[in-house]
């Protein structure tokens, strides 16, 4: 079966028979006694400062969580512990837990409890690995210190004066991990803290983020102890404590998940969604050397109808579908490391991102990337498409150091959603590392449009080099480039190219839409001239040149948040209909615009310096109003989106103009800006934005109060009017110092508000 083949290839799993007994396991049976010691006199714990810790997963018989955050399917461990042979280990989801907790006295008291618990004595001797100087200074009145060490090999371990090692960072090698493991087995204690999701941001040699399952040294150590650091983030401010409630245990969740997959009789204590979520967090982090849990879930999935449970026409896969959820997860993880020649087409790939017609030619094409394109950065479109599970061969002339290849534009990951209309993760990006023959092979189980991504050091660099590539095994995709006479001349032929996804390109915007939506598009020139003008509007309002990198917009059938979201690319729904796209409906775009498109690109254009608390969904809509006027002839004050907002100010003023209410209502807040625009036009906004750009970086406002002051003074200076009374009327706090800066101007208030 597919799942069996994929997993056995990539994970090198032993046979399910290696599991041994199948009776119930007393997961975390000793947790109560240990947590009583760890949480003695602790009433509350919370996030350390402004850090975002990662997840800690407990899955072994002798491991348990001490603190978690959230609830239901979204509950995540953040501090875990385990006993291992004669020793003990305590794991934190971030090193900042050691650096001044920021959660009151209980945080520091908990660290004292933790060190004593790990040592099994009141006055342990503590060594610090790869840091911990601040912690040592704070704790020196409580414990004897045996030193600070940058290398595990230098640690004085058991028999040499150390009871507990506090591991603050670094990445010891396999030999050093062995020393720490032996230290714990012999009765030593280890406290470690690391941000696992932060490590995923570090690129490996293949152009991928670090894999916490294979690359995170800490997981290689604590995995054998029944703990792993997972890839989820835990941003909650307050934590659940084991002294107050039962916390999740992935071993127990695994029992429930297997029962749900195999249809075993008996009611489970853990709901399907929670079981699947907990096991998913474990499987994404569990080292491949595990010979118990991975084979167990693989064996259960092999007996299920996995391929029938993936998303398809008229069928979503719910997170609570344990077999579908975990089957897709394990297959996705397996395919990451599978050699290109052995990557299969994923079940459901023909549904999305889509099928390639039978008989479509696989072609070889040479592509030249100019130095200018390399400097611009971003994804460089090729007009080529990789079929699901089909090998793409790349060769380069003049070297490809630092270059990456991307397959697929639909980059949103959906694992956090309650249900999936498509596989949750369907794109890949790889470093171009040529084999001795000078070529590189890659395959995606889902297929997708092919892009080249320039080296980071080339982006914006005057001396950036271009590159020449040969791509073999791809299918031609519809592609139009505004300003290229050949592209316009050959459009009627190119729009019939067989790939299921098309791209329309101009200097400022690239649209990625279903090919079916452009098969009848006769005038791509007029359409992309519209989008070029739209792209120009954003820097035009901000008073700055067009950015070098074009914006991108990609249609999808499901995205990670909302109906649309900002970023690179802007992601939007719309692919549900393969024969239609609002992005190519020029008649509607020129008469009504598209508030959603303009809004999301407005997020990309807004600046922190003039966006303070409560205006994240406001300052971007200045661009929505501007483009509505420029691209569809809609007067900003008469924009339909404002129609439902115009009655709000009177009610707000009548209630006393409370700033907290203002910040909670983006439509109300936008009226404050729109009223100025109505009476003075766009020029003062352009003048104010340009003043921000021209100001020294050291003068950039940082706090909300500074941003509020600066926005009032910049706009007052642009208008040559004192806006202090206007801001006061709206309830937006301004300091007396800022009021004084513009007091020499004539005060202004809209006519309908009365005299200032």
Predicted features and spans:
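Catalytic beta-strand/loop cores that center a nucleophilic Ser/Cys/Thr
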Residues: 23-85, 100, 137-144, 162, ...
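Short alpha-beta junction capping motif
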Residues: 82-96, 108-117, 125-129, 156-207, ...
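A short, well-structured beta->alpha microelement
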Residues: 139-159, 436-437
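Activation corresponds to long, low-complexity, non-globular regions
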Residues: 234-235, 240-347, 501, 507-516, ...
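Active-site-proximal alpha-helical
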Residues: 252-284, 511, 646-739, 747
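Beta/coil-rich, acidic/histidine-enriched accessory regions frequently appended to metallopeptidases
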Residues: 305, 309-355, 362-363, 704-756
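Beta-strand-enriched, solvent-exposed domains that form extended recognition/catalytic surfaces
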Residues: 339-477
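Catalytic cores of extracellular degradative/oxidative enzymes
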Residues: 490-493, 497-681
